[in-house]
């Protein structure tokens, strides 16, 4: 509170869900900078409209927390990569992307689930190569499929940077099993490994396609040459 007892909020939060598309966006950033307070957009930013001017404005601001964008569909990957090259040239701060998945899954559509998981990992692969974090956002439809728990396991790995940056998805799954064996008397297969094995059995004919993505590691995938000139 100030000297008159009035509540003074330490941060400014903004709820506009598409503020980047506003023509006077850089003016808004300048006004926020002028307040002297850290600020944060509470919705994911739309990187598709990012340009040099917007990237510079955001990178010089007192932003609170991680910058968060959205990478919802694989078909956007060329555009997202072009914008990432701009963004990474100007911003050194941690950058995270929401990764939407699981939409319109039904209980018997195995092909759709495989393609959805495969292209989810292709998006993660791009983010890793640019030194960015992913955050898996599951639509409730993922629960319709008998293999829906694979999304839960992916989210448990991807949404926690200490795992995402240090181990592959496959290593994370195996670590769950070893942790259970080390800390309990149970001899059962843990839920994570059981889900992984069921996924592999179901898609054995496609396993060679997705296995390298499950074994992909952040530290071996990040490539500064993608954005450094």
Range-by-range predicted roles:
Residues 1-83, 93-101, 133-137:
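Core AdoMet radical
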Residues 33, 88, 125-129:
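Anion (oxyanion) recognition and catalysis
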Residues 89-90, 115:
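Extended, compositionally biased non-globular segments
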Residues 103-229:
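Auxiliary Fe-S-binding modules of radical SAM enzymes
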